[in-house]
Every structure is written in C-alpha cells, then in structure tokens.
C-alpha cells in the first residue's frame, strides 16, 4: 500500500508494495501522471516477458509533484536472468536512455548496478533524497500479466 506523502512531498522510508491499480489510484492524480502510468504498464509487460519479477519506482513520480518528467526505477536481477534479453527494451548504455524515456516515459536500471555519482547500488541510491535522508520507493511484483 502506498502511504500518504510526508510534509516534504516524499513517501515515508521503505519499499511500499503496490499493484498497478493501486498506483493509478494513489499516484495518477494528473493527466501527465496517468500518461506515465500507461507507459509504465507497457514497459512492465515487456520486462515481465524478459524474466523481471520485481521493480522499484522512484524519482519525481513518487513525490507530490503534479507533472513529473518521467519514472525512474530499478529491477531485481534474478539468478540466471539473461540481461541481454533486456537490451531491446532497456539498453544499458547511457546513449540509449533517451529512447526508453521517449518510448515509455520510464528509465530502469538493474537494482544491484552501482549509480556512478553516489557509489551505491540503484536500489539504495533511490531510497535517499539529495541530502542523503531516507525516503520511500514503490515496489511492484510482476506475476504473469501486469495489472
């Protein structure tokens, strides 16, 4: 369940489980946000087909900002998962990040990959604000069809 935003417009620290429907209800409060959720749904369907089972959402999308630019996120890498199968969807090169933003409105990274600026894995990096204080993310389990 996605909690209410803090006074700072962030989620309480932790990974808050949600379904796509809960995401629509709680975070789809502007046209821009609903458009981003539609792109996210398309992306999650493709990612699920590549073996992704769990994703974490972050960025301005999981704040009270009415018009977030995109959705940032990361996904758990499952044992034996072929990351190359993700290439058509999420090229792991910074040169192609704009393509995933344009196609889906989202940017995803492997959760255990280190974010260069912070030196932390993306999942840890996403759970801190710019000042280093803890904040929340949305966690989604992909089981079969995305719903």
Sequence positions of predicted segments:
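Short hydrophobic/aromatic beta-strand micro-patches
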Residues: 74-76
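Catalytic core of pol beta-like nucleotidyltransferases
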Residues: 1-54, 58, 62-68, 78-147
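Acidic active-site catalytic centers that drive phospho-/nucleotidyl reactions
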Residues: 70-72
């Amino acid at each position: 369940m996605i909690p209410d935003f803090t006074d700072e417009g962030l989620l309480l620290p932790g990974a808050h489980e949600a379904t796509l429907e809960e995401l629509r209800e709680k975070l789809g409060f502007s046209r821009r946000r609903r458009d981003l959720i539609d792109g996210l749904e398309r992306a999650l369907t493709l990612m699920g087909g590549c073996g992704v089972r769990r994703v974490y959402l972050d960025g301005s999308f999981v704040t009270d900002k009415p018009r977030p630019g995109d959705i940032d996120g990361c996904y758990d890498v499952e044992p034996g998962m072929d990351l190359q199968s993700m290439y058509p969807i999420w090229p792991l090169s910074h040169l192609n990040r704009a393509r995933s933003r344009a196609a889906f409105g989202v940017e995803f990274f492997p959760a255990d990959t280190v974010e260069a600026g912070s030196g932390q894995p993306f999942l840890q990096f996403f759970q801190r604000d710019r000042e280093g204080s803890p904040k929340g993310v949305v966690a989604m389990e992909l089981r079969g069809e995305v719903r």
